[in-house]
A protein has these predicted regions:
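Membrane-embedded and interfacial regions of multi-pass energy-transducing membrane proteins
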Residues: 2-619
């Protein structure tokens, strides 16, 4: 009997794993994105810890200069492309269909392909640690330092090809969500009735659609320089390294808004829920988000003031860098207006949202200072820049993401995160990040350059570096508290119910966690804050507050069937990418494994396109 039970348990586990591999359910894909991205967030944090350990005192030899360059490169790359972006994607996947009243995204299998290709990119780039070829050219990979002979191993191939895989994932996801938001909104949900999170997500998908091709061109050219001997960025052979900087930053500055706009949308949903009043200045927040998306294309060269662009170019980008602060300021004043006069409840999601506002103001002010070209010459490539980007991406994006995690965790799991541990997490994070990053402003103004692995006592940077490294320890403790909170809450947390925050969005009208079909009956939206409208009507009519939608038999709802072809196609892409790292000349073919991978991709696409979306039983 024990043997039979063991086999049944193994079969059940294998069936469950296969279910996750073949899933096309946006909610499961959102969870996959979130878990993978959080693991990579921790990996990036460990890489940062190694750097802070090395810099905690003058003259330390914790790691070699080569390893320090690898940690520096992988920390930035991982945090930007494999942590913050996919954490945002986790919210896109899970929340967008729920918040617009849809049963899934427009292209469920393409959604699955996006995740598996993202995972392929993560595995491919980090495989460099296994084979001793870790990228070491900086997360921005400035050519020609990222070219041969300055970076001699295969690390930068892992970097450039890995990011091309990530670019494929982001591009198809962006197009998928554009179609989803345009076509699958519930009846009555006009554009100006959409939640701000949906608006900011929509702007981000459009930014991705235009920004990804730019960096893809640069990555292809860099890879061709390294693998096939082209000279796009080699000045000794007529190439232009400044071309790489333009390509990278034309993508890179919209990328900043790709990272920060979703958390802005998150807190625009959190603040009204915990202020018990509608969002102040909804149209201004929406149009300021659109303005940020448009103006983000006009500021890239403030990263390049020391390149020698000339006074006219510097003057133009100085002006645009100042102007982009205006729509951001509009958002901040509207968020403050939402708080003003509200019945504020300082639950953990609200604390992280308010913390986001405070920290993003500091990051924004240090960013606007880059518009002063003469002082930017002094700030360029110093720790002042490190401080600025971390106040924007940690104080902004990460705090906003944690606000969203605490806000929607009950919807995803049906359990509330522990409020006491959550507040400990917030306050320790808040103190830790300021101890870590605020001293970097002074280090930069005192002349400490980025990317150095050690320094002499005579420079006077030791005390501030020690304080910054101590702040990292505080942040580490905060992350441990968060992980403990998640694990214990999943095991024995308080049941959340369907609407624990008395929130206004459509996602709170259904059970927690949501059924596989989301909505048994598609909702009809009568205005902004649709669930508040329903609840107020019930109160006015003397009725009980409405509960969640009634559950129905999933077999009666039209849903797409699982498919393994998206994962198969992504595996083909991974083999295709790996093939360029292994040179095995066969006849006239230099990279036969890449050809095998390409054939697998072709087979996957062909089979995918001929697979019916649903079987007859689900019609």
């Amino acid at each position: 009997m024990a043997t039979v039970a063991s086999k049944q348990s193994q079969n059940s586990m294998l069936s469950n794993i296969w279910g996750w591999i073949t899933t096309v359910d946006h909610k499961r894909i959102g969870i996959l994105y979130g878990v993978t991205a959080f693991v990579m967030f921790l990996v990036a944090g460990i890489e940062a810890g190694i750097m802070r350990w090395q810099l905690s005192m003058p003259g330390l030899d914790v790691v070699s200069p080569d390893v320090y360059n690898q940690m520096f490169t992988m920390h930035g790359t991982t945090m930007v492309f494999f942590a913050i972006m996919p954490l945002n994607a986790a919210f896109f996947n899970y929340i967008i269909p729920l918040a617009i009243g849809a049963r899934d995204v427009a292209f469920p299998r393409l959604n699955a392909f996006s995740y598996w290709t993202f995972l392929a990119a993560v595995l491919f780039m980090n495989f460099g640690f296994v084979v001793g070829a870790v990228p070491d050219g900086g997360w921005f990979a400035y050519a020609p330092l990222s070219e041969q002979p300055y970076s001699t191993n295969q690390g930068m191939e892992f970097w450039s090809i890995g990011l091309m895989l990530a670019a494929v994932s982001s591009a198809v996801a962006g197009l998928n969500f554009i179609v989803t938001i345009v076509n699958l909104r519930a009846p009555g949900m006009s554009l100006m009735r959409m939640p701000v999170f949906i608006w900011m997500s929509f702007v981000v998908q459009i930014l991705l659609a235009f920004a990804i091709p730019v960096i893809a061109v640069g990555l292809i050219e860099l890879t061709m320089d390294r693998l096939f001997g082209t000279v796009f960025f080699k000045p000794s052979a007529g190439g232009d390294p400044i071309l790489w900087q333009h390509l990278f930053w034309i993508f890179g500055h919209p990328e900043v808004y790709i990272l920060i706009l979703p958390p802005m949308g998150i807190i625009s949903d959190v603040l009204p829920a915990f202020s018990k009043k509608p969002l102040f200045g909804y149209p201004f927040i929406v149009f300021s988000g659109i303005a940020i998306g448009l103006m983000g294309w006009a500021v890239w060269s403030h990263h390049m003031f020391t390149v020698g662009l000339g006074p006219i170019a510097v003057s133009v980008f100085t002006i645009t860098t100042m102007l982009i602060a205006v729509p951001t300021g509009v958002k901040i004043f509207n968020w403050i207006g939402t708080l003003w006069g509200g019945s504020i409840e300082y639950k953990t999601p609200m604390l992280f949202a308010v913390g986001f506002i405070a920290m993003f103001i500091i990051g924004g002010l240090s960013g606007v200072s880059h518009a002063v070209a003469p002082s930017d010459y002094q700030q360029q490539d110093t720790y002042y820049i490190i401080a600025h980007i971390h106040y924007v991406l940690f104080g902004g994006a990460i705090l906003g993401i944690f606000s969203g995690i605490y806000f929607w965790f009950p919807k995803v799991t049906g359990k509330l995160l522990n409020e006491k541990l959550g507040k400990y997490h917030f306050w320790i994070t808040f103190v830790g990040m300021n101890l870590t990053f605020f001293p970097m402003h002074y280090l930069g103004m005192n002349g400490m350059p980025r990317r150095i692995y050690t320094y002499a006592t005579e420079y006077g940077w030791d005390n501030l570096n020690a304080l910054s490294s101590f702040g990292y320890v505080i942040l580490f403790i905060a992350m441990v508290i968060f992980i403990v909170n998640v694990i214990t809450s999943l095991k024995s947390g308080e049941d959340a119910g369907h609407d624990p925050w008395n929130a206004p969005g459509l996602e709170w009208t259904i059970a927690s966690p949501p059924p596989v079909y989301n909505f048994s009956d598609l909702p009809v939206v009568e205005g902004r804050d649709p669930y508040w409208i329903i609840k107020r009507r019930a109160i006015a009519e003397g009725k009980e507050l409405p509960g969640p939608q009634a559950l129905v038999d999933p077999s009666t709802v039209h849903l797409p069937d699982p498919s393994y072809w998206p994962a198969f196609t992504s595996l083909g892409l991974l083999i295709f990418a790996t093939g360029f790292m292994i040179e095995i000349p066969v006849w006239f073919v230099k990279y036969p494994i890449a050809i095998v991978g390409g054939l697998l991709v072709f087979v996957g696409i062909l089979a995918w396109s001929n697979e019916p979306i649903t079987r007859e039983k689900n019609h």
